[in-house]
Amino acid sequence: MSGLPVKKAGLIVAVEMFAVFEGWGQPDEIYEGRYFKLCRYDRYDMQIFVARSGPGQKNAEDAARMLIDDIGVAELWNFGVAGGLTEAAHVGDVFVIDEVIRWDGVCGSGVFEADGAERGRRCGCGARPEAFRVDAPAGAADVRQGVLASGDSVVSARGARLMLADITGADIVDMEGAGIAAAAASGSYPCFMVKCVSDGIDTDEAMLTADFRRTARRAFDAFDMMLKKSQV
């Protein structure tokens, strides 16, 4: 890297860290952060700090705020798997998120612990134009813009997923996106999320187990392609 200031970016990963290791190899540095262990990669003329948060909104929000406050990252990223909420969200489809909807309360309160927002809050998530100038990863039906519903409860039943889609207008659901979006919104930090559908509305448990690693890696590959494109 040159003597110029190096851009720092933060990547929050819930449980898909294996895909980072498979795609980028071993990190340039590993050390203990305030809440979570951090891996640093020097790639694309940047320092990329990766925090494995584990599942859940509060963990993801804590990881994002640690990256902002302790590392001084300029933007936040996330890739990972998500559940499909409609018939149109197929296993293997890749979504670049342009809006995150907080859909459930923490501990039944109806208020999101990370920022005190009521359920139903909508956060913009900055889908980048270059995301739509890349080829879909092998086998993916589509790479498209989408809306992410995000909450601390697991939504698995077909009826519950269809109802959530109807209420929120979301395409997919996860358990971390709202925490990351809340941290980004608190300081107007750019936020970029890429999700791959690991389970559709009719996916059974056996299929989910079989598809998880494949779709997590597909999410990473799509994210990495878009990241390369954005640095050109």
Walk through the language-model features, giving the residues of each.
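Regulatory input/activation interfaces that engage signals or partners
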Residues: 191, 196-232
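Structural motif
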Residues: 10, 74-77
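A C-terminal functional module that forms or caps the active site or interfaces directly
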Residues: 153-202, 210
